[in-house]
A protein has these predicted regions:
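Exoplasmic/lumenal beta-rich domain surfaces
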Residues: 99, 311-372
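The catalytic-center signature of Zn2+-dependent metalloproteases
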Residues: 101-123, 164-245, 319-324
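Extracellular Ig-like/FN3 beta-sandwich strand-entry sites
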Residues: 295, 309, 373-377
Length: 406
């Protein structure tokens, strides 16, 4: 699904989630904390109960005809299409799945505009509505679908949390996503998976100061970013028009830490399924030094004890300069120089791509070899791609650019 197919301009969407939250994973890396997980690797599939509400404007798009129950079933069927797409990514990258609560129909509205509880404010009102209709203890994550041009998770890392005040910024049921055409990947991946990613503990990854609002330690993708927690297509300088359907290393790190050891680990054992699938291994290799203005290759390795088909994702792990809006340049001494890309079956990644190297180039628009001395930090994430209950592994390494050689 292409964002260009939406009826509103591309830049009408803004994620307003506040970033003033400190998760333990943000201050620890390379497994320096023995209780921290950087990966989806504990052989558990976690199921979270989703209370999914909607405004009448959203409901009217999908209600169709029939009885009240039939119309609500039609609306929830569209919600299920969105969540099937979202769950597919969450299960593969995070071993998380979400299911509708039994009483979800009581959160679905359609009919006269203004007949629902929302009147322009969606976060606090969503929490109030869900709690009043189904009860605080009956769900783990609450969200609202509407047709406004924005999204706001209402919190970061609050899923399954104990805070009962919807106005607190820590309530589990205050997420919302709105688009005039709430269908397809432009809605499901770019926006719903993004906002729910915040609710589970993920921060923004885009580094452009035009839309920078992350943790200060997670803005590791140039420009708008291109993975789920970025702003692809809606923030200059744009890497591409739409988000790719995966979470980057920093988001897997933070969300995994939260659901295994943080607030979002607070679910009963009956919602955690143990499985036999073992995590893969990842080896990013040793740190090394290269001359300035020199193309290079990242060579990794991985294996899977169960023989699953593994994929590899090399990503730069350098938070960006707060003052930068442009694509990376060769003289940039801090921040990301290389964009994130979807995983491949090759353990190696050429920087920039081999096709460019063969022409003598050392850069593309979003992949630039530095001409100054600096460090480039990289992560290698290995996925085993099991349909439900996928596991990941990661390893970190550093390339030091010698500013006097080359």
């Amino acid at each position: 699904y292409n964002k260009a197919s939406l009826t509103k301009p591309l830049n009408d969407f803004e994620c307003l989630t506040k970033s003033g939250v400190n998760l333990p994973s943000l201050t620890n890396d390379r497994n320096s904390n023995p209780n921290q997980s950087l990966n989806t690797d504990d052989k558990k599939l976690r199921t979270y109960r989703l209370a999914q509400s909607c405004t009448a404007e959203y409901g009217n798009i999908f209600a169709g005809t029939g009885t009240d129950a039939q119309k609500k079933a039609n609306i929830q069927a569209q919600m299920a299409i969105t969540m099937t797409r979202v769950n597919g990514v969450y299960e593969k990258d995070l071993s998380i799945t979400m299911i509708f609560i039994a009483a979800n129909a009581s959160l679905i509205y359609y009919g006269a505009v203004g007949s629902d509880p929302w009147s322009g404010e969606y976060n606090t009102q969503t929490g109030l509505t869900i709690d009043a209709n189904v009860g605080f203890s009956s769900y783990d994550i609450g969200h609202n679908f509407n047709t406004s041009g924005g999204g706001n998770a209402g919190c970061i890392g609050c899923v399954a949390g104990p805070n009962t005040d919807p106005a607190s910024g820590e309530h589990k049921g205050t997420g919302m996503t709105g688009r005039s055409n709430p269908t397809g990947d432009a809605f499901d991946i770019d926006y719903v998976a993004h906002e729910m990613g915040h609710q589970f503990g993920g921060f923004h990854v885009q580094s452009s100061s035009n839309c920078r609002s992350g943790s200060g330690l997670t803005e590791v993708e140039p420009g708008s970013g291109s993975s789920i927690m970025g702003y692809a297509g809606i923030c200059a300088t744009n890497v591409q028009a739409n988000s790719d359907a995966y979470f980057g290393y920093v988001n897997i790190r933070d969300i995994s830490d939260n659901v295994q050891f943080g607030i979002s680990s607070n679910i009963p054992a009956s919602q955690i399924a143990n499985f036999l699938n073992n995590p893969p291994t990842a080896n990013a290799g040793a740190d090394y030094v290269i001359p300035k203005s020199t193309a290079f290759v990242l060579e990794g390795a991985g294996s899977d004890p169960d023989g699953n088909t593994i994929t590899y994702n090399w990503e730069e792990n350098d938070p960006g300069d707060r003052n930068s809006t442009a694509a990376p340049t060769a003289t940039r001494a801090v921040g990301p120089m290389f964009r994130s890309k979807t995983a491949t079956t090759s353990p190696n990644r050429f920087m920039p791509p081999m096709a460019n190297i063969l022409t003598g180039a050392t850069s593309t628009t979003m992949e630039v070899c530095p001409s100054v001395g600096r460090d480039l930090n990289f992560s290698l994430t290995v996925r085993d791609n099991v349909a439900t209950g996928s596991q990941t592994a990661s390893d970190l390494m550093k390339v030091t650019v010698n500013g006097t050689a080359g």
